[in-house]
């Protein structure tokens, strides 16, 4: 995640949620808005679990994003963890995330 910045304002989240593309995968929801900026946000609500579980799921999603980062187009990405993320293996999540990003046409 060297090249990507974090979201800074609530308006950025709102614009991606309203205008951007959305794709449901097993364990994660991906929001993508094509933009000249390179930004990322990883979100896990309290539905996912307690703080330890939420933090672990966010770390996993960040690690997966780092694997695909160099192949992705510029834009704003939001990854929302679903509550079943805790039951899936890392390789299964990787496969699902890659499939979702491909469906959203995020790869260069």
Swiss-Prot record:
InterPro entries: Ribosomal_Su5_D2-typ_SF, Ribsml_uS5_D2-typ_fold_subgr, RNase_P, RNase_P_CS
GO CC terms: ribonuclease P complex
One Gene Ontology molecular-function label: tRNA binding
tRNA processing is among the record's keywords: yes
This enzyme's EC code(s): 3.1.26.5
Reactions accelerated catalytically: Endonucleolytic cleavage of RNA, removing 5'-extranucleotides from tRNA precursor
BP-aspect Gene Ontology terms: tRNA 5'-leader removal
Alphabetical list of PROSITE patterns matching this protein: RIBONUCLEASE_P
ATP-binding recorded as keyword: no
Keywords, comma-separated and alphabetical: Endonuclease, Hydrolase, Nuclease, RNA-binding, tRNA processing
Sequence similarity: Belongs to the RnpA family.
Quaternary structure and interacting proteins, as annotated: Consists of a catalytic RNA component (M1 or rnpB) and a protein subunit.
HAMAP family from the UniProt entry: RNase_P (MF_00227)
Role: RNaseP catalyzes the removal of the 5'-leader sequence from pre-tRNA to produce the mature 5'-terminus. It can also cleave other RNA substrates such as 4.5S RNA. The protein component plays an auxiliary but essential role in vivo by binding to the 5'-leader sequence and broadening the substrate specificity of the ribozyme.
Descriptive protein name: Ribonuclease P protein component
Organism: Campylobacter jejuni subsp. jejuni serotype O:2 (strain ATCC 700819 / NCTC 11168)
Gene encoding the protein: rnpA
């Amino acid at each position: 995640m060297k090249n990507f910045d974090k979201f800074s304002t609530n308006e950025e989240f709102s614009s991606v949620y309203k205008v951007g593309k959305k794709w449901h995968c097993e364990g994660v929801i991906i929001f993508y808005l094509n933009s000249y900026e390179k930004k990322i946000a990883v979100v896990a609500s309290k539905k996912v679990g307690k703080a330890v579980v939420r933090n672990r799921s966010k770390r996993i999603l960040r690690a997966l994003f780092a694997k695909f980062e160099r192949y992705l187009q510029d834009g704003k990405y939001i990854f929302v963890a679903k509550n079943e993320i805790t039951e899936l293996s890392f390789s299964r999540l990787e496969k699902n995330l890659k499939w979702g990003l491909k469906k959203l046409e995020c790869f260069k």
